[in-house]
């Protein structure tokens, strides 16, 4: 009997089971203990294989692939701290709904807690963050193959969103020629091997039913808040709100076209919040709201009803409003709850939104961070997509720009960490094959710098804008102690990214004005490669411009 051969047959059943649930992309890190899984994945022609030497980046690469494909993405890593490096991506997926299947190789039980190398307690290490956790036994023919495949099917068949952790212990030897060991065990699955359906089929249903009193509420004064959603959903939501005559407050991730732009500016005006107080119902479609003023208004508003519609489970409302939590696909929910043509009831807010945008436009000529955020829609590639980082840059784009309706926008706004942003952007590009504009800050770029290796492999032009304001300038917007702000919060690194781009053989530009930036973009969109554009800006201008605009718009 060959242990290595049966390890591979066991792994082949696991990998084949994944294909029956739509898994096509599989991300693999180097490792010895994961050899059975890696070789089984390599031999399965259903998979598109991705590799990376850093497990944290690999997890985020998978996250980006899942964001675009809307299908589960598998990750294979070896045992030990390699597994722990998947934690950030798993947490993000749990909050934003992407499906990740984490296949973590492990030492067999007799090598745990006895001083064996690279052996840690892996079962349960992700606590409550996976939607499902499976701790498989070591491969043995005493356990029928139908148990193994149905165990995988149950976890994936009932997966609505988030991650599945499948811990896979393998005993040595891990290498060797294949023989007939376990062949009859494998063949007991019969014609399942020629089929394309799961062994065990389950169909989870979390769809909320139609709200029977919608005909009543749609005649009231309402407000639509649009959070994270797909591009197609964004266009439908914009039309739905327009038909109802309800003001639409669109987040940067809503892809609604933000018909009332600069919401995070005009929500600081008392006239706007006073008018919004007249709303009898608020319907929030999508979660992960970005703007500080939007979140403040959302927390303080007191309509008769507050509805939240999202296909992710959970409350999704830090303000704990009285109302309804409706778990549904947004587009499907809109069809069940059609709009009735009515005249707009808000008068003051459209005027304030226009004046806020004009105030932003009046400042657009200076070469700076806030101005780039406002101009970002001018630089979007045709038939492309946008990936926005976290901290100051996403807040500036949310407050100062107006993105086109239906233009795809991606981000990691679940836990809102700055780890893995470049890796996620790489996954977004690979899954879509579209030209991609990604924008992050300098600390975010440093945090995931080795992901530039992933950006060497793109199928369409990708431009990475690094806004270098020399530190975490988001803390300039917070009441951090002035005496310790630079040392303990901003942490300026005084670095530039030309040599990093050169190390990974990526094109690089460092424009000094808008004309040079436009020239760099024109060059970048011509070829299917990655271009790093470093925009070096004054460290405080972005935060100060936002604060000045907030003060100006609050007094309109």
Swiss-Prot record:
Binds 1 thiamine pyrophosphate per subunit. It comes from the Bacteria. Pathway: Quinol/quinone metabolism; 1,4-dihydroxy-2-naphthoate biosynthesis; 1,4-dihydroxy-2-naphthoate from chorismate: step 2/7; Quinol/quinone metabolism; menaquinone biosynthesis. Its cofactor is Mg(2+); Mn(2+); thiamine diphosphate. Its EC number is 2.2.1.9. Pfam families: TPP_enzyme_C, TPP_enzyme_M_2, TPP_enzyme_N. Gene3D superfamilies: 3.40.50.970, TPP-binding domain. GO terms for biological process: menaquinone biosynthetic process. Belongs to the TPP enzyme family. MenD subfamily. Homodimer. This is 2-succinyl-5-enolpyruvyl-6-hydroxy-3-cyclohexene-1-carboxylate synthase. It comes from Shigella boydii serotype 4 (strain Sb227).
């Amino acid at each position: 009997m060959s242990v290595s051969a049966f390890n591979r047959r066991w792994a082949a059943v696991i990998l084949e089971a994944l294909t029956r649930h739509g898994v096509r992309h599989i991300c693999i890190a180097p490792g010895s203990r994961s050899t059975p899984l890696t070789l089984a994945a390599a031999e399965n022609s259903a998979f598109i294989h991705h590799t990376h030497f850093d497990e944290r980046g690999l997890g985020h690469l998978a996250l980006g692939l899942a964001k675009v494909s809307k299908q589960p993405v598998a990750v294979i890593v070896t045992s030990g701290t390699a597994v722990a490096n998947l934690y950030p991506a798993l947490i993000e997926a749990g909050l934003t709904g992407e499906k990740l299947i984490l296949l973590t190789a492990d030492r067999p039980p007799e090598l745990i807690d006895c001083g064996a190398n690279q052996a840690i307690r892996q079962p349960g290490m992700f606590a409550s963050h996976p939607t499902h956790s499976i701790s498989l036994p070591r491969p043995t023919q005493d356990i029928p193959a139908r148990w193994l495949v149905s165990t995988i099917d149950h976890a994936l068949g009932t997966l609505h969103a988030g991650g599945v952790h499948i811990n896979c212990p393998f005993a040595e030897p891990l290498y060797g020629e294949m023989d007939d060991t376990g062949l009859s065990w494998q063949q007991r699955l019969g014609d399942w091997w020629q089929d394309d359906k799961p062994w065990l089929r389950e169909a989870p249903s979390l769809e909320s039913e139609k709200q029977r009193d919608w005909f009543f509420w749609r005649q009231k004064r309402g407000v639509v808040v649009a959070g994270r959603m797909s591009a197609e959903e964004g266009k439908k939501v914009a039309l739905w709100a327009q038909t109802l005559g309800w003001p639409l407050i669109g987040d940067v991730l809503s892809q609604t076209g933000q018909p009332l732009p600069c919401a995070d500016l005009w929500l600081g005006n008392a006239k706007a919040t006073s008018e919004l107080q007249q709303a009898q119902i608020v319907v929030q479609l999508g979660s992960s709201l970005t703007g500080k003023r939007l979140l403040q208004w959302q927390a303080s508003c007191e309509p008769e009803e507050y509805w939240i519609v999202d296909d992710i489970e959970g409350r999704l409302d830090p303000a704990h409003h009285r109302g309804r939590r409706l778990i549904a696909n947004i587009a499907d929910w809109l069809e069940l709850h059609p709009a009735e043509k009515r005249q707009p009831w808000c008068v003051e807010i459209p005027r304030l939104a226009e004046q806020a945008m004009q105030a932003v436009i009046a400042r657009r000529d200076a070469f700076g961070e806030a101005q780039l955020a406002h101009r970002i829609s001018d630089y979007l590639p045709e038939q492309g997509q946008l990936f926005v980082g976290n901290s100051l840059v996403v807040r500036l784009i949310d407050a100062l720009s107006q993105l086109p309706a239906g233009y795809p926008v991606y981000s990691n706004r679940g836990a809102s960490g700055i780890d893995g942003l470049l890796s996620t952007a790489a996954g977004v590009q690979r899954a879509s094959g579209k030209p991609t504009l990604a924008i992050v800050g300098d600390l975010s770029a440093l945090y995931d710098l080795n992901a530039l290796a992933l950006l060497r492999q793109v199928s369409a032009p990708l431009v990475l804008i690094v806004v270098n304001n020399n530190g975490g300038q988001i803390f300039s917007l917070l009441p951090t102690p002035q005496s310790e702000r630079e040392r303990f919060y901003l942490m300026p690194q005084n670095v530039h990214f030309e040599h990093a781009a050169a190390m990974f053989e990526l094109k690089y530009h460092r424009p000094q004005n808008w004309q040079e930036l436009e020239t760099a973009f024109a060059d970048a969109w011509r070829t299917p490669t990655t271009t790093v554009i470093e925009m070096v800006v004054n460290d405080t201008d972005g935060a100060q411009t936002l604060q000045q605009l907030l003060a100006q718009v609050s007094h309109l």
